[in-house]
Amino acid sequence: MYSTVRTAVLDGISAIPVQVEVDISTGMPVFDMVGNLTSEVREAKERVKTALHSVGIVLPAKRITVNLSPANIKKTGTGFDLPIAVAILTAMGVIDADSIKDCTLAGELNLNGEILPVSGILPIVFDEYNKGIGKFIIPKQNENEGRLVCGAKIFGISHLNDVIAQFDEAAFTCQKTGMAHEVQMDEKYADFCDVNGQKFIKRACEVAAGGMHNILLVGPPGAGKTMIAERMPSILPPLSENERLELSKIYSICGLLDNDSSLRDNRPFRNPHYSVTQAALIGGGTRINPGEISLAHNGVLFLDELAEFKGGLLDLLRAPLEEHCIRLSRAGRNVTYPANFLLFGAMNPCSCGYYPDMQRCRCSEPTLRRYFDKVSQPIIDRI
């Protein structure tokens, strides 16, 4: 008995189609999974077996082989649980194979058969719909996110029993078609008009905002550097529709997209602490997730206390500042994320912060040089 179900794996902000193949044949009762899988995907075997048992499905005492194709692509994430379970049910004859034709599935299972939300639903639905796939079965909590793609037929489910009952009817239905692109205005910008005085600095910020130029403010504590930076997004041009979609994809991958049927319409403002790690700043980790520079895409990346960032960390921004993207490599995977941000740097004029007020500043000339040398010249050139 053979069956196949379509799903997808994320590659940057794009989705690559994956076929979940299941073969149930005579032999020793073994459950094998192959196809270049990470540990979290291999763990799906136990989740699927227990979830099926909890809904009253007894696996046959035969050899069950699950293959995630193509095998040259690393499979990551927990969204393969639902496709694997449905593929097994199809091979067993519980679900009609014709009912899941031209349908993409994604979702995580817990041990009692509930469907849990997964990250990255928006790029999966968007790319699969552009490839001609019109029907999608996804977790109920991700339903509104999937409906952001106009024309896509979304079926949100909360339990494995919903899948079995739906397909027993031998006809796929959805509640309604995809919704038009609405916008999300959940963040209210701090108003740039709140800045009093500072005529020269305000003019410099306006020029920087007009052309998405990087800017560095150097001044003593309490001069208003942070206040000005926080109000920078309010004078940036509005996001275009393509920019909203691209930004929403990034936030969907990170699980930060609000499930309220709307795309992000606000320019992001990211303010990482100077103790941030390399993976958190530029991206990385086991799944190679986007970092702060990608979350600041089409917005402002504010680096306060610029000279206090760990040695070499700022130099990692050289390529993104020029290429407006970041290329990450880990464990044989190469992922590219957008990173077109306005870098807003702020720092004190010296270690104590009061130079050139010689009545308060106690920094020597060598101390001043060492302080400014913490920010490399290539980074200064790009600002």
Segments (PLM) and residue ranges:
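Conserved AAA+/SF3 P-loop NTPase catalytic/coupling segment centered on the Walker-B
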Residues: 273-277, 289-322, 354-357, 376-380
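Substrate-gripping "pore-loop 1 plus following alpha2 helix"
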Residues: 315-337, 356-374
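AAA+/SF3 P-loop NTPase mechanochemical coupling elements
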Residues: 269-270, 288-298, 328-349, 359, ...
